[in-house]
Amino acid sequence: MKCPFCTHPDTRVADSRLMEERNAVRRRRHCPNCGKRFGTLETAELKMPAVIGPDKKRSPFNAQRLRNDLTAAARKSALTPEQIDETVRLTEHRLYTSGQRDIPSAALADMVLKELLRQDTEAAVRFAALHKRFDNPADFASWLAQAVKTGGKA
C-alpha cells in the first residue's frame, strides 16, 4: 500500500487486528521510506446486484420501494412494521451476499415471497398477486394451493 505521507509505493504491516463488530481488519502500517506510521481499515466491498425487470431493463435495487410494496401487501394483515423492516433487511443481506451481478425481478419476488409465506400467508398472497406473473387465474390458484399445502414453506 502506498504511504499517504511520502507516497512511497511499499509499506509494511506492523500489526493486524480483527474488528468483529464491523467485519473489518484494522492494520497498523509503517513506511520504511519516511518512517511514519498510519492505520488502515479494510472491509469487503459487497455490491448490490441490479434488478432486471420484465422489460429487460437494469435498475438499482430500491429498498424503500420494497418496503412500500410490503406495507401495501400487509394492509389488514397481522404483519407488523418491524417484520416488514426485517424482511427488507434480510432481502438486502441475501442480495449483497449472493455474489450475483444481476437478479431477475421474478427471482427477487420469489425470495421475498419465501420469507412472507413464513410470516403471513395473507400478505404473501397480496404480494404475489402484484409481483408474480400469472398467465391466467388457474396459475394463481395453483400457486396459492401449493403455498397453502406446504404451509408457508414454498
UniProtKB/Swiss-Prot annotation:
One of its GO terms (molecular function) is DNA binding. Binds 1 zinc ion. The keyword tRNA-binding does not apply. It holds the Pfam family ATP-cone. Its cofactor is Zn(2+). Signal peptide: none annotated. Keywords: ATP-binding, DNA-binding, Metal-binding, Nucleotide-binding, Repressor, Transcription, Transcription regulation, Zinc, Zinc-finger. A zinc finger (unnamed) spans 3-34. HAMAP family: NrdR. Belongs to the NrdR family. Negatively regulates transcription of bacterial ribonucleotide reductase nrd genes and operons by binding to NrdR-boxes. This is Transcriptional repressor NrdR. It comes from Neisseria meningitidis serogroup A / serotype 4A (strain DSM 15465 / Z2491).
